[in-house]
C-alpha cells in the first residue's frame, strides 16, 4: 500500500532499524531476510533523499534526519496497531503473547514469581521478558516498548494509567550479631552507622527508601551501593552495617539469611506498589487480562499479610 508515493511497509522496516540499530536484528524483528532489509534501506534512502543510517562496525548510527523521523514513525505505527487494527480477544490457553515488564528484583521475587507460576498453569504458551529498572521508563511506555511498569507509586510518571497492587512497609535491619543493634536505635546512631543501599539504572537512581528518607530530610552514610535489593541481606551478615528494606523481602529471607529487625527511628515508612501500562494499551484485551491476574494475585498477598498479622 502506498501513500503519496511511500510504501507504508517501509515504515515498519524503518522503525525496526531505528529500534534495533543493527541490520540482522532489525530483519529478524519483522521476519525479513537480510537482503530484503538491505533493499528496504535503499528504497527508504531514495524516498527521503538521505542516508538515514551510517554503519559503524556492526551498529547503524542514525543521521539527524532519521533521528527526527523516529518519534513520528513509531507513534504512527502504534496508533495504527492500537487504534485502527481491531484487537483480537485473548484466549489464554491458546495465546502465545509475550509480555515485557520493567520491575525491581524485589518485585520479581516477591510478586511476579506468583504471577508467572499462575500463568504457566492457565496460559502455558504465554512468555515474559522481565527487564531491569530503566532510567527513562516513561519513554518506553510512550513508545509501547514495554507492557507494564511495576514500581512504588511515588516513582511512577503520571501520564499513563496505573493502579495500586499492594502496600509495603520499610524496616531497618542488620546482622543479628551486630552489637550496635542491641539497644533501640536513636536517629543520631541511625545516621552515623554505615548503610547498604540499592540504586538502579545507568544513572544509579535512588530506590524508594532513599526517596522516603530524603523526604524527611535525612541523608544516610551509604558505605555500599548495590544494583538490587536481593543482594543486600547476605552483605549485612557479619558486618556492622544496616539497611532499610521492604518487610516482605526480609520475611522471604528469614529461613536462609535471618536478619534482625530493629525499630526504625523514623515514623513508619509505608508506600503503595503499583502497576502502570501504556495509555495506548488501555483497551488491549491481552493487557486487561494480565492486569486482572496481577490484581488478583496482589489481593491474595494482601489477604495473606493481614491473616499472618492477626
Curated annotation (Swiss-Prot):
Regions annotated as coiled coil: none
CDD domains noted in UniProt: PBP2_NodD
Alphabetically ordered keywords of this record: Activator, DNA-binding, Nodulation, Repressor, Transcription, Transcription regulation
Record domain HTH lysR-type: where: 6-63
InterPro entries: LysR-type_TF, LysR_subst-bd, NodD_PBP2, Tscrpt_reg_HTH_LysR, WH-like_DNA-bd_sf, WH_DNA-bd_sf
Binding region for DNA: 23-42
Keyword Transport: no
GO-annotated molecular function: DNA binding; DNA-binding transcription factor activity
Keyword Membrane among UniProt keywords: no
Database matches in Pfam families: HTH_1 (PF00126), LysR_substrate (PF03466)
Family, as annotated: Belongs to the LysR transcriptional regulatory family.
Function: NodD regulates the expression of the nodABCFE genes which encode other nodulation proteins. NodD is also a negative regulator of its own expression. Binds flavonoids as inducers.
The protein's name: Nodulation protein D 1
Organism listed in the record: Neorhizobium galegae (Rhizobium galegae)
Amino acid at each position: 500500500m502506498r501513500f503519496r508515493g511511500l510504501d507504508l511497509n517501509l515504515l515498519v522496516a524503518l522503525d525496526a532499524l531505528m529500534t534495533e540499530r543493527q541490520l540482522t536484528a532489525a530483519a529478524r524483528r519483522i521476519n525479513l531476510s537480510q537482503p530484503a532489509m538491505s533493499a528496504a534501506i535503499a528504497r527508504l534512502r531514495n524516498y527521503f533523499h538521505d542516508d538515514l543510517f551510517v554503519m559503524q562496525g556492526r551498529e547503524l548510527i542514525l543521521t539527524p534526519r532519521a533521528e527526527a523521523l523516529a518519534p513520528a514513525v513509531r507513534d504512527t505505527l502504534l496508533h495504527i496497531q492500537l487504534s485502527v487494527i481491531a484487537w483480537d480477544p485473548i484466549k489464554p490457553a491458546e495465546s502465545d503473547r509475550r509480555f515485557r515488564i520493567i520491575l525491581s528484583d524485589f518485585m520479581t521475587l516477591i510478586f511476579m514469581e506468583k504471577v508467572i507460576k499462575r500463568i504457566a498453569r492457565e496460559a502455558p504458551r504465554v512468555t515474559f521478558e522481565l527487564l531491569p529498572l530503566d532510567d527513562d521508563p516513561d519513554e518506553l511506555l510512550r513508545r509501547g516498548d514495554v507492557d507494564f511498569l511495576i514500581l512504588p507509586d511515588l516513582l511512577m510518571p503520571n501520564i499513563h494509567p496505573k493502579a495500586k497492587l499492594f502496600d509495603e512497609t520499610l524496616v531497618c535491619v542488620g546482622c543479628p550479631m551486630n552489637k550496635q543493634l542491641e539497644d533501640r536505635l536513636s536517629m543520631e546512631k541511625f545516621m552515623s552507622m554505615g548503610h547498604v543501599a540499592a540504586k538502579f539504572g545507568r544513572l544509579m537512581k535512588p530506590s524508594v527508601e532513599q526517596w522516603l528518607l530524603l523526604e524527611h530530610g535525612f541523608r544516610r552514610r551509604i558505605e555500599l551501593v548495590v544494583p538490587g535489593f536481593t543482594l543486600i541481606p547476605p552483605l549485612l551478615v557479619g558486618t556492622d552495617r544496616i539497611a532499610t528494606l521492604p518487610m516482605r523481602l526480609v520475611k522471604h529471607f528469614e529461613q536462609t539469611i535471618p536478619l534482625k529487625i530493629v525499630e526504625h527511628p523514623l515514623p513508619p515508612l509505608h508506600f503503595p506498589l503499583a502497576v502502570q501500562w501504556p495509555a495506548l494499551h488501555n483497551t488491549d484485551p491481552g493487557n486487561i487480562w494480565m492486569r486482572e491476574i496481577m490484581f488478583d494475585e496482589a489481593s491474595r498477598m494482601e489477604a495473606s499479610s493481614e491473616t499472618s498479622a492477626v
